[in-house]
């Protein structure tokens, strides 16, 4: 099992190209199930979750081909993938595939909309709380689906097709918004989605669906209107830059000090995060090619945050920000409102010398003068990279174990960091 070895103390200087967003790539790939034409996606990141979803789509009969190239010498391996779901051969998504990644459950929406039925295993993924699928299933019920839960599977049918409806989510959910949006494109009549997720990835999906012939307006706001169409066609769509990856590297620079251009990053996707990092002592400016992040001799200042749906502070950057706050000159408070069990990294950060206490959904972080390297273990995707950030500033050697979590969401992380001066190596086996 691979590990990441970090020798801390080096500042980061250089350019880090930001890859395509995993959280946008996955729903756009699933949208290929809605048409028998070819959907071509550009800027697809090379990640374990993407490869797993390709296997799941192939199980349903989706053909695919990959074109890959480096956009420039030090850039990410940008991939264009062509998906063609001309013949859906199976509407069952089995446990052995779906259990490995939660987002794979989203195939239930397109399969139900196009084929009138879907039999999908209840999902797996990061162990950061129960993350129930009730919101998603209730949305499909509102569109006229019949759903039974039997033997760990959601069995859904729409005997006469889905029918548009007005539906308000009781709680904002990105995944449920994705699924309802995809299903509604082929429903009869108009669907109005209220309290919809506003994330940039939702807008990217809507742009993709519109390019395929859907009639969607309002994506990126809390109310989305969908006028159903009889069929969708192929399209060519580019996946947006990964704002979580960009925010992660911005925090790494704030942690170590230095001067890094995050190539392709967009301030509009990260305004809350960037303002928080400015309060913490980083200087951040938008350029024609991305975001430049600088931290010179000034120390890290403590900042309190509360995670919220977009445009608030994203839960997917909470662990990384906690890693940064372990070196702040004072005490900070981090409150998690999205998931009920997303503090599993606290114990591992403590192994590096962090002082963190928990009370309910709030972590109190007392900044320390120094961290010291140690063996630590990744518990989930975002927690794993918080340990990398802490290790970059720790004295001595840090070994991060179980880095398969990292490979689910960060494309060639050790390569990108080492090119900016970090002493980071992958140890195989």
UniProtKB/Swiss-Prot annotation:
GO cellular component terms attached to this protein's record: cytoplasm
Modification 2-(S-cysteinyl)pyruvic acid O-phosphothioketal occurs at: 126
Residues annotated as binding UDP-N-acetyl-alpha-D-glucosamine: 102, 131-135, 171-174, 316, 338
EC number: 2.5.1.7
Keyword Cell wall biogenesis/degradation: yes
Pfam families noted in UniProt: EPSP_synthase (PF00275)
Role summary: Cell wall formation. Adds enolpyruvyl to UDP-N-acetylglucosamine.
UniProt protein name: UDP-N-acetylglucosamine 1-carboxyvinyltransferase
Organism: Brucella canis (strain ATCC 23365 / NCTC 10854 / RM-666)
Gene that encodes it: murA
